[in-house]
């Protein structure tokens, strides 16, 4: 299903009450909402990723008391994002604790396309995806999940500029800030990662926890312009962005075609 806004309808929101024992002085009101076995969350990082794709969800997951959030890559050397931000992994892929509850892939540009043909990473994701409770992505990270064969027959979204590549990877393209199909949860471009993070916190810890977190983050977006989607943007701005993204669309499409041919050879 596509999701936007609150996970609760109006009637359910009226019934939302603080958990037993909660007071302003007793922040243990959220503490006792922790599961008996804290979640293991694996967030892939890689050279050329978009930092905000990662940071929005990581901020939300990091506020889940007791959860273990692992930033994973092939080794423990810092990786540089597409804007030059360096992020240090906390675990190598080979050392990831098993099993994980959630596997996550952020998007990017050239770095994402490179990952779509990286056998080591794709094999790792395919293996973890078999047992993870949730298989997830933000932005063009869904193309990496698709290249790993994890979106075959699933509805999924991506950044609007590359969403049309998904069918090549046998996924069913869908629009929406967050799209859920069984245990696959994908989000749209970049800033959708914050919505995605809150959505996953609600699924893992409940709506009360997620709404408290939303307030703590003061997440109440009021963008200065209404050009955040192709439908809302002025035609000339949309055309400009489309031209700017054309090389990425082409390279991602070629990478997806190559991956599909690889599947055919081994089927």
Q: Which residues does each PLM region occupy?
A:
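Residues at secondary-structure transition points
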Residues: 115-119, 157, 188
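Flexible glycine/proline-enriched surface loops and loop-helix/loop-strand junctions
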Residues: 108, 179-183, 194
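A conserved active-site-flanking secondary-structure segment within enzyme catalytic domains
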Residues: 151-178
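Short pre-catalytic strand/loop immediately N-terminal to key active-site residues, enriched for Gly-Thr
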Residues: 129-131, 180-185
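Active-site-proximal catalytic alpha-helix in oxidoreductases
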Residues: 142, 185-202
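Extended, subdomain-level signal for the structured scaffold at the beginning of enzyme domains
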Residues: 1-135, 143-146, 163-165, 173, ...
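Structural detector of well-ordered beta-strand residues that form the stable sheet scaffold
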Residues: 135-136, 157, 174, 185
């Amino acid at each position: 299903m596509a999701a936007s806004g609150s996970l609760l309808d109006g009637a359910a929101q009226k019934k939302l009450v603080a958990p037993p024992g909660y007071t302003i002085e007793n922040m243990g009101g959220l503490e006792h909402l922790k599961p008996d076995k804290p979640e293991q969350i694996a967030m892939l990082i890689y050279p050329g990723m978009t930092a905000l794709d990662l940071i929005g969800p990581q901020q939300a997951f990091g506020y889940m008391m007791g959860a273990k959030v692992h930033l994973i890559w092939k080794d423990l050397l810092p990786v540089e994002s597409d804007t030059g931000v360096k992020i240090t992994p906390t675990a190598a892929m080979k050392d990831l604790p098993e099993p994980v509850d959630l596997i996550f892939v952020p998007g990017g540009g050239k770095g994402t396309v490179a990952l779509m043909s990286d056998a080591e990473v794709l094999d790792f994701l395919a293996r973890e995806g078999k047992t993870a409770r949730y298989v997830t992505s933000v932005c063009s990270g869904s193309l990496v999940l698709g290249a790993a064969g994890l979106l075959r027959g699933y509805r999924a979204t991506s950044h609007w500029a590359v969403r049309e590549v998904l069918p090549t990877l046998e996924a069913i393209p869908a629009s929406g800030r967050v799209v859920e199909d069984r245990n696959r949860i994908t989000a749209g471009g970049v800033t959708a990662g914050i919505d995605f993070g809150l959505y996953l916190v609600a699924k893992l810890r409940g709506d009360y926890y997620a709404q408290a977190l939303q307030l703590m983050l003061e997440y109440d977006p009021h963008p200065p312009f209404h050009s955040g989607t192709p439908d809302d943007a002025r035609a000339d701005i949309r055309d400009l962005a489309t031209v700017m993204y054309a090389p990425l669309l082409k390279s991602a499409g070629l990478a997806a075609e190559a991956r599909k041919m690889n599947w055919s050879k081994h089927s």
